[in-house]
Structure formats: structure tokens, C-alpha cells
Amino acid sequence: MLTSHSFPPLVIRGRSLLPIVQGGMGVGISAHRLAGSVAREGALGTIASIDLRHHHPDLLERCAQSPDRATLEQANLTALAREIHAAKALSEGRGMIAVNVMKAVSAQADYVRVACESGAHAIVMGAGLPLDLPDMTQGHDIALIPILSDSRGVALVLKKWMKKGRLPDAVVIEHPAHAGGHLGVTHLADMHDRRFDFVRVLEELETVFTSLGLKRDDVPLIVAGGINSHEAVRELLDAGANGVQLGTPFAVTEEGDAHPNFKRVLAEAAPEDIVEFVSVTGLPARAVKTPWLVRYLRQETKIREKVGALKHACPTALQCLSVCGWRDGIEKFGHFCIDTRLAAALRGDVANGLFFRGREALPFGSAIRSVHDLIELLLTGATRPSVAGRWAFFLG
């Protein structure tokens, strides 16, 4: 556990943490081993709630014997409870264990309920405006952390939640031009809009807080997307952020829950290997151009023209998304089974998987290092390697 660094702590619901947050990554990329290891260092580790049954052979066997929606959903809820308990045990009482729940997921309320009942310390929710999250967690002592991308979204959530007598315990501000996975914009062309620049959002939120009668320290602000160095952390905290969130750099650590092939694909990707596209959720997304994705994007226009408006049966029977371009026949959305592709990536199936990744270089280049090494590098600059051709992060 790192004890010597120069940054103030990130305080969330009375817990004093290192100002480092590990982002939630599904399917199964951030499960108990990664989240628990991050928390054991004194930071905030996050379990991605979606489809965790893939880490549990007995649950997969049960689903194979009864491949219906009810069985699959119950298996995933059981897996989530197991992962939370395992992460808390691994953390040895340090740090904080959060559960990430996507607003776009059909079973969001059940995931939130199980997270609360299983002793998670926080719920993190993105992929949509989590306006009803305080209602879903009524009666539970749990931190609530929405993920948003601009000051307008933060202001809306603050106003709605304040009417319910609740403030967010922190807010993650994710920059769509840098982050991996699903991005907080409506259209691909919007991701580089200046309204998402970290400094601008932090400055605008000073005004928002004042207008709502809030003090700046009432709600910690955590910035996310492209952060890959001690210098970037210092610059962002000096600019007014209370913490930083990273996803891809944690996914490729030794403790990351994915197959080694998954880590190699992310760690060895060059800038030209990373692509943005429209997911089946309708949201823009960022991933590595692996063989399946290259084929899909090459045929995307033809797929939309031929079957884009046709509804299809869910290939897994899980019905994981509340709105799905493939299942619901929404022509402008993506047209593939995202659960199948993400599960393939988790297993290390390079040919068939969908490998979400952030845009920027990784702190250790293509090297696979430990969670401790990553946090130490981010907070102190120690053990920083000399990586030829490493791309720099510039604060926007």
C-alpha cells in the first residue's frame, strides 16, 4: 500500500482514499481480483456488474443446462454477489469497492439491489442519466457516483437529486475523446467538442455549484479519460479535480481479470489500431481493430441496408440491453451481439472478440505491470520507464 505521495486524499462518504479510481470494465474485465487489488492499495476499485457469470464455471454450466433468460439473469446476480464478497475480502478492509451499473442495461435495478445487499461501498452509473439512482438505493448507506461528460449533464443530475434530498457522493467527468468503451456523446462527431475539455468543465461547475448554493467541496469531482502519467495526474488535480479515473491502464495489469491475450491486444495496440464506431446501444464506442471488428466495420453499411430495420431474436436469451440495435431493428445503431463479442474478448479470443480500449498510450507502454506499480507511478512518478515513442497526454 502506497503511503508517501504529495496529493490530498479523495474523500468519498467519509472514506479517505488515494486520488485514484479504477474504472468499471465489462464483460468481466474488472471483477473481484482487479477491484480488490486496487482497493487494497487504498484506492477505489470498481467491479463491472454486467454478465459476471463468465468467471464462474458452475454458473456457466447451469446456464448451459437451462439457457433461458431467468436462469441467465439469476446467474449474473449470483456472480455479482460472489464478486463483491471476494473483492472485499481481498481488499483487507482498505480502500473502497464500487459496482458499475450501466443505465442502458435492462437489469439495472436488480444489479443495484444486489450491490447494496452484498455490501458494496458505492454504485457508479453511466451510459445514460442516472436520475432515479437515489430512488433505487433508498434505505441503503451506499455512495452514489454518476458518470457524466459535461457541466450541463452534471447540473441536471444535481438539480434532480437535490429535489430528492440527495447529493452525489462524487461525480466522474469522462472525456469522450480519450476514454474507451461506450462514450458519453450522442454522435461520433461530438466527441472532440470543446465542452468536454476538463478545465472548462471544472470551471463551469464552479459556477453551477454556486448557483445551486453548494460549496465546491460538497461533491468531489473525478476526471476520466486518457490519463497515463504522474504529470497528467498532477496537472488535473492542480486544475481542481479531486481524483482521476483510469480504465485501460488497470485492465492490462497483472491483477486484471481478463485473459492474458486480452491484455496483450490492448497493450500492443498502436494509435492506428484504435477506432471509434456506433455500438448496439446507439452510443459511440472506442475499441481495438481486431479481426472481427475490422470485418464488421467493412460490412456495416451493407448490414444496415439489408437487415438494419429487422428485429432479431436475442442470440443469448439474456436481453441484456434495454435498447439493442440488433434485437430491436434500429437501423442507425450497431448490429451485432455485444455480450457475445465482449465475452469472447474476456476469454482472449482475439479473432472474434470486441476489445474496448482508451485512445491514449499506456503508462508502461506494452509492459504488463502490477496494480501497485501503476498507482505508484501515477502518484509519485517512481519506476517510470523510458518508453520510446510514448504518446503524451495534454490537458484540454
Regions found by a protein language model. Give the residues of each.
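Residue-level detector of alpha-helix initiation sites
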Residues: I29, I227-N228
